[in-house]
Amino acid sequence: MAKKKIVIGVIGSDCHTVGNKIIHNKLEESGFDVVNIGALSPQIDFINAALETNSDAIIVSSIYGYGELDCQGIREKCNEYGLKDILLYIGGNIGSSNEKWENTEKRFKEMGFDRIYKPGTPIEETIIDLKKDFKI
């Protein structure tokens, strides 16, 4: 079976790169083919990378607190560009620190994300979920 291909990157004006590189390395070590678009990436860069590489999933990372704004409409754009079945994950500091996590998670589910990870979630948890979702 061919390796599953995953686009990763840091959305919006967020420039954290260390965590992005760790995610990249851990995914590769786990047998995934990783397309890393890096930091400071708009939604369309994730979508174009997924289209150009025939990717199976997109993992969006955001630490700077504006992930919700940056991700508005991303599922609709994926659908519009023919990526209706692509897995869409997000993790990092994506909500208000004063808000209950369940509320943040609910909003991102409503935005069309398949999996949502709170700050500090080990990448190994994401890898387990990817394998479940890919049935591998």
From Swiss-Prot:
Enzyme class of the recorded protein, top EC level: isomerase
PROSITE patterns with a match to the protein in the record: B12_BINDING
Keyword Isomerase among UniProt keywords: yes
Gene3D superfamilies linked to this entry: Cobalamin-binding domain (3.40.50.280)
InterPro entries with a match to the protein in the record: Acid_CoA_mut_C (IPR006159), Cobalamin-bd (IPR006158), Cobalamin-bd_sf (IPR036724), GlmS (IPR006394)
Pathway note: Amino-acid degradation; L-glutamate degradation via mesaconate pathway; acetate and pyruvate from L-glutamate: step 1/4
Residue intervals of the B12-binding domain: 3-136
Amino acids binding adenosylcob(III)alamin: S13, D14, C15, H16, T17, S61, S62, I63
Enzyme nomenclature, EC number: 5.4.99.1
GO molecular-function terms, A-Z: cobalamin binding; metal ion binding; methylaspartate mutase activity
Coiled coil: none
Biological function: Catalyzes the carbon skeleton rearrangement of L-glutamate to L-threo-3-methylaspartate ((2S,3S)-3-methylaspartate).
Protein's UniProt name: Glutamate mutase sigma subunit
Gene responsible for this protein: glmS
